[in-house]
Amino acid sequence: MSSMPKPERHAESLLDICHDTNSSPTDLMTVTKNQNIILQSISRSEEFDQDGDCSHSTLVNEEEDPSGGRQDWQPRTEGVEITVTFPRDVSPPQEMSQEDLKEKNLINSSLQEWAQAHAVSHPNEIETVELRKKKLTMRPLVLQKEESSRELCNVNLGFLLPRSCLELNISKSVTREDAPHFLKEQQRKSEEFSTSHMKYSGRSIKFLLPPLSLLPTRSGVLTIPQNHKFPKEKERNIPSLTSFVPKLSVSVRQSDELSPSNEPPGALVKSLMDPTLRSSDGFIWSRNMCSFPKTNHHRQCLEKEENWKSKEIEECNKIEITHFEKGQSLVSFENLKEGNIPAVREEDIDCHGSKTRKPEEENSQYLSSRKNESSVAKNYEQDPEIVCTIPSKFQETQHSEITPSQDEEMRNNKAASKRVSLHKNEAMEPNNILEECTVLKSLSSVVFDDPIDKLPEGCSSMETNIKISIAERAKPEMSRMVPLIHITFPVDGSPKEPVIAKPSLQTRKGTIHNNHSVNIPVHQENDKHKMNSHRSKLDSKTKTSKKTPQNFVISTEGPIKPTMHKTSIKTQIFPALGLVDPRPWQLPRFQKKMPQIAKKQSTHRTQKPKKQSFPCICKNPGTQKSCVPLSVQPTEPRLNYLDLKYSDMFKEINSTANGPGIYEMFGTPVYCHVRETERDENTYYREICSAPSGRRITNKCRSSHSERKSNIRTRLSQKKTHMKCPKTSFGIKQEHKVLISKEKSSKAVHSNLHDIENGDGISEPDWQIKSSGNEFLSSKDEIHPMNLAQTPEQSMKQNEFPPVSDLSIVEEVSMEESTGDRDISNNQILTTSLRDLQELEELHHQIPFIPSEDSWAVPSEKNSNKYVQQEKQNTASLSKVNASRILTNDLEFDSVSDHSKTLTNFSFQAKQESASSQTYQYWVHYLDHDSLANKSITYQMFGKTLSGTNSISQEIMDSVNNEELTDELLGCLAAELLALDEKDNNSCQKMANETDPENLNLVLRWRGSTPKEMGRETTKVKIQRHSSGLRIYDREEKFLISNEKKIFSENSLKSEEPILWTKGEILGKGAYGTVYCGLTSQGQLIAVKQVALDTSNKLAAEKEYRKLQEEVDLLKALKHVNIVAYLGTCLQENTVSIFMEFVPGGSISSIINRFGPLPEMVFCKYTKQILQGVAYLHENCVVHRDIKGNNVMLMPTGIIKLIDFGCARRLAWAGLNGTHSDMLKSMHGTPYWMAPEVINESGYGRKSDIWSIGCTVFEMATGKPPLASMDRMAAMFYIGAHRGLMPPLPDHFSENAADFVRMCLTRDQHERPSALQLLKHSFLERSH
């Protein structure tokens, strides 16, 4: 016979395998009282991860720790296998009464035969007896009574094991390790239930059941749905278990029926469940499911017990009332192990148990039930699927009569098995009950067939269980999930509520018939199918519903996969790597499918395209996937732009059968009219579009797009027919670029943008939002962004995005409406943006400005989440307007907000689809509104085309007022754009930000040559070296920061003088690059950190690039006197350059090398500044992770600067120091300065920087870090050792200094002080 896979010993499982592998079959078959009948759910382990829908009832052994408590397991409805485990009692053997011994001998003899007949393999002391399926000879009477079929997933069969009530004098049952001596008096095992069977068999020996007569016990809590996972241990805490005791006594006649034929009516197991089967009513479910019966049923239980008890007492001589049932019920509470139930409760329970049975039921039902049970049990032996009839009357057994009192009773019996106070003149001792209880416990423990490890904690201490797994013989069936067993429990007169089962598992093939006690559904496939579908639904839900309001696009190659490709702002800070061929971004299969999409144009109005013709931009081109929008259909029909055609907006100039179509855009009344009609709907959509939370997500695949998205998608689908490749978009968009980007870029539009986020708590003036819609006309949609510089504001924004409703979004020339109070339709970004410029002057609301050329690029059907310049519109709090200037060939926006008082750079990213397209970079400079008075600086052109700007801008404004664009205007814009591009070819521009010495902001921007092809221009960032330097245009306004107020210098706006910077000597080499000294043509010294990207390995280059992005992200957000200032970034060929403030003094290590160890007074001052900088980092959830002498720089004025944030990381959130949530699991840093937790990889938190500070102070004091005499690896092992003691400072240093270092080098990071605490240390007081 095939055996069930033997349960593994789980840390939290009571299913300890039987200890005696040598025990004879007789021993095995004679069940110790700890032996457990396990109702095992055979469902697949994968199904367990659904919602823990299976509630497995398991009874805990007496020995079990009360803490093993119960954990409610939701009843598994899938497939239930009843496995009977026969754990051996580990408790020391105790003497058996002569009477008991005799009974056992009888039982053993009978059981011996049975055991021999069914020789059971006892491999690891797991007895898996396959019970073949046989029809029950009799249907339990109680089950017949049951009218409302109930699905008892977890039937505690433990109660099925009969115990003789005659064993009154037996001290607590002891299951002894050596089963072979089972027959001996001293070692009487909890096989008392077997004994009871024999006793009962005395009345009807013919019904001998296997030691584990699989007596269906009512003690099965139906699903307790509220707890999908392991129930909280709160249920263990049952304050007044005593109140439940009376219920325990309610032994349901059902037990009689349920009890094996050997078991007398008295042996009826108390049903642990309320007749109504209400999971809420407190039905004690075996083990973890134990819900305590409610006291309202107390009297009924008592009465039933009294009746049953009296009857039992009468029959006790011949038929020992198996307190086994009591025991079982007790056992079920044993799971709870509440130590607060007095032993008297045990006695009460015993009495109740005997009383509960009604005499008449006892006789009639007992016999029939025994017969049924015996036959069933025997059948079980052969029938894997017949669970066992558990005809238990829920008659008044309200919620398992076994209450905590029994549980405690068991414990009390353990503690004082002799503390028997006979209740109701019962000669029964709680010891007997105890034994029975233990038997029940062991018997009723539930083994989870699939994941044994998932057993409740209570199971951990279970005695070894010989698992007679019913189904394992038909292992294929079991593996396929034996469908759940439906057990109906007829209740006498009491209404039954349908069993509550998890809805996900609700679909069952078999339904319980009133006339059938057990329904075994068909195979598991259906359930599994359900589970799979359910899981897929869950997956799709969880992954597709990430921060996306209603509609969102999931990037997938084939079927919609809920894989989201996120690229944080950090990852997009830098321009796309030049080494990356933009072509791969367009997957070939997408190109092939584009023609097909054209065929589907007619259907796009009603359905979304299955595949997007243009892949959304994912950070890694190699993993780029097409975007499959999962969008919710608009709640109400909208005209939007679905009714617009290309003929409404574009005039096809040139097209070929195979090539892309080239269109010229022009304003038409219908187009403008549509824009007007949708202006009122913008507010609704504003709430749908959300700014990236915490990070600029270049998540092209996941944009929060609203209903507009679906509409736009259809519009875009029409457009896709003309776009066979990414390049085609350029032709389409040329006019857009001319109209908008050039208008802005050539004019460097300095319009006032009011960016007050007063109510929003956002300090940064400009906001970037993923374009929520499909960027309809972005000419460079496919162009991968070249983000050269990004100012600290961006990182600030990562945490400070305003309410979505307040953001007005400028979609990338998409056919969507942008969101604004007086919003602009994204479809006419051109018109709307121009119009916004006008509104800007009126200060009604901040205008979203055309962010970058790339947003005007290829109309990607997906909004590639281009970060369009999002000017937050806050009409209520419009107190200031910052001028916004967009410079042509820059993809980045620099914004100086009054809140941050510093120049901030924004880089906008776009797809890089064509090889020649390195995106333009735009700079938006926010100026004080004061300088913008009288509209004098509405538009300013930078570049050599300043002349004529006024007239063109005036035309633009006029056209905006008329809300229509004329051919003349378009022509002017196009001519201006071309002229500007020609003049600015091969130019490298730099934005120099002059501030006070502490806040020198110098940002270098590179503009690339812009070759033209097919009337379209694509940009390549090329840094042209002139001799030893690079030409840089000073395109930035000079900001004088005084009194924390920025003063705009209008003269600087007109500065066109090129700035060169020359590379100088190497200042140092860090973990991620080499730092050079640079001199600009303005005479400023800067530090330039250059990192060469590996062109041969694209993946490695991307990884390195992301590291640099993260470093820059951090640097831009950090503004502190003790942290080096960030000036900008540049991508030159395959080298990334980061421009930083130059610290001429050098590092502390170099100072030590030059001057030797520092005096205490000196390093005390330095230490204080280091701590101040670190405290600032930690306050902003950043850990430096590489603090050492080489990374601490000294200004000539004595100011300390922390540098090299290549290892720095931002913590998940601002948690308590040392908490697991903000621990980083990677090892970075230098071994001599590494904290023990870093070396041990137990998590890197803020406190790890404190350790490094201690080592740095030690280094400043002695000239070398601690353990410098050791080899690097030896030092690592020493520091990582738990007992390794760090050396103290030499004796000649003050006690305060030594104590400071000692505190920093505290091995336990939880005891290590924080930076703020150390700043209050007495050692630093002298630094004042």
Curated annotation (Swiss-Prot):
Alphabetically ordered keywords of this record: ATP-binding, Kinase, Nucleotide-binding, Serine/threonine-protein kinase, Transferase
Stretch list, region Disordered: 1-28, 44-74, 344-380, 524-561
Pfam families the UniProt entry points to: Pkinase
Active site residues according to the UniProt entry: D1186 (proton acceptor)
The Protein kinase domain, residue ranges: 1061-1324
Reaction(s) catalysed by this chain's protein: L-seryl-[protein] + ATP = O-phospho-L-seryl-[protein] + ADP + H(+); L-threonyl-[protein] + ATP = O-phospho-L-threonyl-[protein] + ADP + H(+)
Top EC group: transferase
Binding residues annotated for ATP, in chain numbering: L1067, G1068, K1069, G1070, A1071, Y1072, G1073, T1074, V1075, K1089
InterPro entries named in the record: Kinase-like_dom_sf, Prot_kinase_dom, Protein_kinase_ATP_BS, Ser/Thr_kinase_AS
Gene3D superfamilies for the chain: Transferase(Phosphotransferase) domain 1
Entry superkingdom: Eukaryota
Biased composition (Basic and acidic residues): 1-19, 344-361, 524-542
Protein name as catalogued: Mitogen-activated protein kinase kinase kinase 19
Taxonomic lineage from the root: Eukaryota, Metazoa, Chordata, Craniata, Vertebrata
